[in-house]
Curated annotation (Swiss-Prot):
It comes from Actinobacillus pleuropneumoniae serotype 5b (strain L20). It comes from the Bacteria. HAMAP family: Gly_tRNA_synth_beta. Its EC number is 6.1.1.14. SUPFAM superfamilies: HD-domain/PDEase-like. This is Glycine--tRNA ligase beta subunit. Tetramer of two alpha and two beta subunits. One of its GO terms (cellular component) is cytosol. Keywords: Aminoacyl-tRNA synthetase, ATP-binding, Cytoplasm, Ligase, Nucleotide-binding, Protein biosynthesis. It is an enzyme of class 6 (ligase). Belongs to the class-II aminoacyl-tRNA synthetase family. It catalyses: tRNA(Gly) + glycine + ATP = glycyl-tRNA(Gly) + AMP + diphosphate.
């Protein structure tokens, strides 16, 4: 089989930087899928992406589809010919559909008789004839939320397309994609190198772009270069660069030929909380801040330019000039905000709606204050501090700094609270109330902060569900999924003795008569348990393990987690499959019993040795494991219950549960009822596959 390397590049105007990597990887995945569907073998598909281009390269792509042998069976010979031996209409119709005559058909003998059959070899198409359609479909299926048209064209794409290049080895593929004729023209850097040049082979692409066009097309290479140079520059200044993955990807998506430089700002700005300065540098300017070895912000920053002059002084001074007004604003807002205490901003919260039916932010803080105190009392936190933090929790939203730099909410509340002389735990809780802010984020450290964070999240969950506005589809305007998962993480990872039903019920009571959903407690709890499913699936825990625990609907998250871990462990035991099957059998037997099933085992009715053995072992385990269940030691309990396997197997092999004698039958059902209840103390293991 002969192969060639295949290149496809789509040259565009500047692509959205936050979407570039996602578009590029999706493009490569789509091409892989299309090649597989076309039955074209290849070694691997590489992807490249820069601000003005998306490209893929399929290495070792077969030059043609493989030939396929087909066998199309027709009617039985007995039905294919009439009494005179002439083909019937059924046979002629089948042959016509195969493109042959009846006498050209082969015959195949089976144990059910002889049949007509058409055998043929379909030659595979040359790969080059399929590539335009493969790329067109791959582009059409990209995750582009908003398309655009350009010029007088009817075609749509994420940005206007100017060039399309498809090479299969040294052959330029002819055709048109997105209304643009395919050619061998590659556009270089907008300001450096050759603006346009041509290539004559798929393998020339990367080298020609770098040497002629001054473009590093490999996204990951560009990213690694920026990271290494940034760390090198920071080290030279005696610091460490703060380089978040998402920002690094975005900066990588903004430049074609990265030039990493450093600049500085006036030291007086360091009097402003570092978070506000960093917000400006990262969010607005896409700069990387630099910290010293003690974690203090230095008056320097790293930026990445898309041009590379011999003397970068003008570029550096330009970036310093751009950032100065933003830092000056932050300084002004900070100094102005310090003139008023956080507590004095409480009345202004009455002017801001949280939600039309649920009242103002002042109403919300009153509810958070009360619920945070309740939670603190349950988990051993300082109730007064939790209530104080709850009261002040939204005051920083009324400050100039947070109004201008919204992502500093919470952290600025902490700084202002410290300035006001609030207790340190209260101040820190104002920042940590929003944790975790995203998947994998750190949790609140103190129990006071946990109390406020949970109170805030449960207030939102209960309130929004309470007015019938649960998330639908992908829409989640109040970020309820994040609030639910964040709450679960706090309770589970901090091992807090909290019950979801209790928390929602207490939260609902604080809304007075504002809630219209009578099932709010059940709805919120079900929603949160559903988030457990997503959490554990992300961890790789089997779905049937989660379903086994969900069947018991434990509403204490820490307890729920302990059950999941125990069942997940139990599932690995040799006896698990047999005991799961036995529990399923028991469940089916008991489901058919009319009326209430007793749990009283009458030892005088134990006839068979096997039922005696099972009854005695079940009774013994009930006594032995009672404290184990009470302490939530579910893995220990299931390990002991695994010892039932042989006894249960023997019981089902030798004992007739539905005996004719009603007393024997009811007693055996009672044995099984007790057996099942032992396992149900942890989960419904009959669900396990």
């Amino acid at each position: 089989m002969t192969t060639q390397n295949f290149l496809a590049e789509i040259g565009t105007e500047e692509l959205p930087p936050k979407a570039l990597k996602k578009l590029a990887t999706a493009f490569a995945e789509n091409v892989e899928n299309e090649l597989n569907q076309a039955d074209l073998s290849f070694e691997k598909v590489e992807w490249f992406a820069a601000p003005r281009r998306l490209a893929v390269k399929a290495l070792g792509l077969a030059t043609a589809q493989p030939s396929k042998e087909i066998e199309k069976r027709g009617p039985a010979v007995s039905a294919a010919f009439d009494a005179d031996g002439k083909p019937t209409k059924a046979a002629e119709g089948w042959a016509r559909g195969c493109g042959i005559t009846v006498d050209q058909a082969d015959r195949i003998a089976t144990d059910k008789g002889e049949w007509l059959v058409h055998r043929a070899v379909i030659e595979g198409q040359p790969t080059k004839n399929l590539l335009v359609d493969i790329i067109s479909r791959s582009l059409a299926n990209l995750p582009i939320p908003k398309m655009m048209r350009w010029g007088d064209k009817t075609e749509q794409f994420v940005r206007p397309v100017h060039t399309v290049t498809l090479f299969f080895g040294s052959e330029l593929i002819e055709g048109e994609i997105l209304g643009v004729k395919i050619n061998n023209v590659i556009r270089g850097h907008r300001f450096l190198g050759e603006r346009e040049f041509t290539i004559s082979h798929a393998d020339e692409y990367l080298t020609a772009l770098r040497e002629k066009g001054m473009v590093v097309a490999d996204f990951n290479e560009r990213k690694a270069l920026i990271l290494a140079k940034s760390q090198e520059k920071a080290t030279a200044l005696g610091g460490v660069a703060d380089i978040e993955e998402d920002l690094l990807d975005e900066v990588t998506s903004l430049v074609e030929f990265p030039n990493v430089l450093t600049a500085k700002f006036e030291e007086r700005f360091l009097a402003v909380p570092a978070e506000a300065l960093v917000y400006t540098m990262k969010g607005d300017q896409k700069y990387f801040p630099i910290y010293d070895k003690d974690g203090k912000l230095l008056p320097h920053f790293i930026f990445v330019s898309n041009i590379n002059p011999e003397d970068p002084t003008a570029i550096i001074e330009g970036n310093e000039k751009v950032v100065r007004p933003r830092l000056t604003d932050a300084e002004f807002f900070f100094k102005t905000d310090l003139k008023q205490r956080l507590e004095d901003r409480l009345p202004r919260l009455e002017t801001v709606l949280f939600q039309q039916q649920l009242g103002t932010l002042r109403d919300k803080t009153a509810r958070i204050e009360a619920l945070a105190g309740e939670i603190a009392a349950q988990i051993g936190a300082d109730k007064a501090k939790a209530e104080r933090a709850g009261l002040l929790s939204k005051c920083d939203l009324m400050t100039n700094m947070v109004f201008e730099f919204t992502d500093t909410q919470g952290v600025m509340g902490m700084h202002y609270a410290r300035h006001d002389g609030e207790d340190e735990e209260v101040a820190v809780a104002l920042n940590e109330q929003y944790m975790p802010r995203f998947a994998g984020d750190e949790l609140p450290k103190s129990l006071v902060a946990c109390s406020v964070a949970l109170a805030d999240k449960f207030d939102t969950l209960t309130g929004i569900f309470g007015i019938g506005q649960a998330p639908k589809g992908s829409a989640d305007p109040f970020a309820l999924r994040r609030a639910a998962l964040g709450s679960l993480r706090i309770i589970v990872e901090k091992n807090l003795p909290l019950d979801l039903e209790d928390l929602v019920r207490k939260s609902a009571a604080l809304f007075g008569n504002k809630l219209t959903n009578a099932n709010v407690v059940e709805d919120v709890v079900d929603f949160m348990l559903g988030r457990f499913r997503a959490w554990y699936q992300d961890e790789g825990i089997a779905v049937d393990v989660i379903q086994a625990v969900l069947a018991r609907r434990p509403t204490k998250p820490a307890d729920f987690d302990a059950r999941v871990r125990a069942v997940s462990h139990f599932r690995t035991l040799d006896s698990a499959e047999a005991l799961a099957a036995a529990n399923k059998r028991v469940s089916n037997i008991l489901a058919k019993v009319e009326g209430e099933i007793s749990i009283e085992i009458d030892r005088t009715l134990l006839v068979e040795a096997e039922e005696k053995a099972l009854a005695e072992q079940v009774i013994s385990l009930q006594t032995e494991l009672a404290p184990t269940f009470a302490n939530g030691e579910y893995q220990t309990a299931l390990d002991r219950l695994a010892s039932l396997r042989e006894t249960v197997d023997n019981f089902f092999e030798k004992v007739m549960v539905n005996a004719e004698d009603a007393n024997l039958r009811r007693n055996r059902q009672a044995i099984l009822n007790n057996l099942r209840n032992l396992f149900l103390q942890v989960a419904d293991i009959s669900v396990l596959q």
